[in-house]
């Protein structure tokens, strides 16, 4: 949950913005959007995969829509090609909640890596668990920097990436 909350903040969601999300997932997907005073908009799911339906995403886009949050369910990745094409067409960001599909592939890409930010929960009731925690992945350096700030209360702990000089390691 905290990882998805950080992801929403990192992509720049602001109060009043809309984020399209699936209704078929843990409530945290929607509540992380509410944390930033944004509005979760539920799109329908594909009855074959239970993942977000790209056509329903398109039907729910408004002038306030800023992002799409997919949740990969039952070990299946969402249709990321169609979803990313919609996102590109409407200049939207994409977050992937991949807690229920770690290790899944979509067209030779690992689930969670085809979005602007991918999240993997490690909560005790997920497929991979450590009791608590999570993993976020992105190939965008600006998002990575923002994620580090959000997760650490805006404090930059390591600025030079020289981990050898840290006494606490």
Q: For the regions a protein language model found, what residue spans apply to each?
A:
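Active-site nucleotide-sugar/metal-binding loop of Leloir-type enzymes
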Residues: 60-62, 110-115
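Active-site region of PLP-dependent enzymes
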Residues: 101-107, 114-169
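Short, conserved alpha-helix that lines the donor NDP-sugar binding/gating region
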Residues: 4-8
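Short, acidic/glycine-rich phosphate-metal binding loop used to engage nucleotide
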Residues: 1, 45-47, 108, 124
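Short gly/ser/thr-rich secondary-structure transition/capping motifs
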Residues: 2, 50-51, 167
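PLP-dependent aminotransferase-like
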Residues: 9-98, 105
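Short, solvent-exposed turn/loop segments enriched in Gly/Ser/Thr/Pro and often Arg
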Residues: 1, 75, 163
């Amino acid at each position: 949950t905290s990882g998805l909350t950080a992801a929403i903040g990192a992509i720049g969601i602001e109060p009043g913005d809309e984020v399209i999300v699936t209704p078929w997932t843990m409530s945290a997907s929607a509540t992380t959007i509410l944390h930033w005073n944004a509005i979760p908009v539920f799109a329908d799911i594909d009855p074959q995969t239970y993942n977000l339906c790209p056509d329903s995403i398109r039907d729910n886009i408004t002038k306030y829509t800023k992002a799409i949050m997919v949740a990969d369910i039952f070990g299946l990745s969402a249709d990321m090609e169609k979803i990313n094409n919609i996102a590109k067409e409407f200049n939207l960001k994409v977050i992937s909640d991949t807690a229920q599909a770690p290790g899944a592939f979509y067209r030779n890409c690992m689930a969670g890596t085809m979005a602007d930010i991918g999240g993997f929960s490690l909560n005790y009731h997920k497929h991979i668990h450590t009791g608590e925690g999570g993993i976020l992945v992105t190939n965008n350096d600006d998002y990575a920097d923002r994620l580090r700030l959000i997760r650490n209360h805006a404090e930059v702990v390591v600025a030079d990436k020289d981990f050898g000089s840290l006494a606490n390691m």
